[in-house]
Amino acid sequence: MADTTGRIPLWIIGTVTGIIVIGLIGIFFYGSYSGLGSSL
């Protein structure tokens, strides 16, 4: 964890990836419950 200079820390990548994945899953379930996901 010492040489994070010039590179993005791993926990930031994990946090951003987790937020994106949760957001996509939330949008997918919201669309399917709204009837928009049935056409996909």
From Swiss-Prot:
Keywords: Chloroplast, Membrane, Photosynthesis, Photosystem II, Plastid, Reaction center, Thylakoid, Transmembrane, Transmembrane helix. Its main location: plastid. It is found in: Plastid, Chloroplast thylakoid membrane. Pfam families: PsbJ (PF01788). SUPFAM superfamilies: Photosystem II reaction center protein J, PsbJ. Coiled coil: none annotated. InterPro entries: PSII_PsbJ, PSII_PsbJ_sf. Disulfide bonds: none annotated. It is a single-pass membrane protein. One of its GO terms (biological process) is photosynthesis. The keyword Plastid applies. One of its GO terms (cellular component) is chloroplast thylakoid membrane. Belongs to the PsbJ family. PSII is composed of 1 copy each of membrane proteins PsbA, PsbB, PsbC, PsbD, PsbE, PsbF, PsbH, PsbI, PsbJ, PsbK, PsbL, PsbM, PsbT, PsbX, PsbY, PsbZ, Psb30/Ycf12, at least 3 peripheral proteins of the oxygen-evolving complex and a large number of cofactors. It forms dimeric complexes. One of the components of the core complex of photosystem II (PSII). PSII is a light-driven water:plastoquinone oxidoreductase that uses light energy to abstract electrons from H(2)O, generating O(2) and a proton gradient subsequently used for ATP formation. It consists of a core antenna complex that captures photons, and an electron transfer chain that converts photonic excitation into a charge separation. NCBIfam families: PRK02565.1. This is Photosystem II reaction center protein J. It comes from Morus indica (Mulberry). The lineage of its organism: Eukaryota, Viridiplantae, Streptophyta, Embryophyta, Tracheophyta. The gene is psbJ.
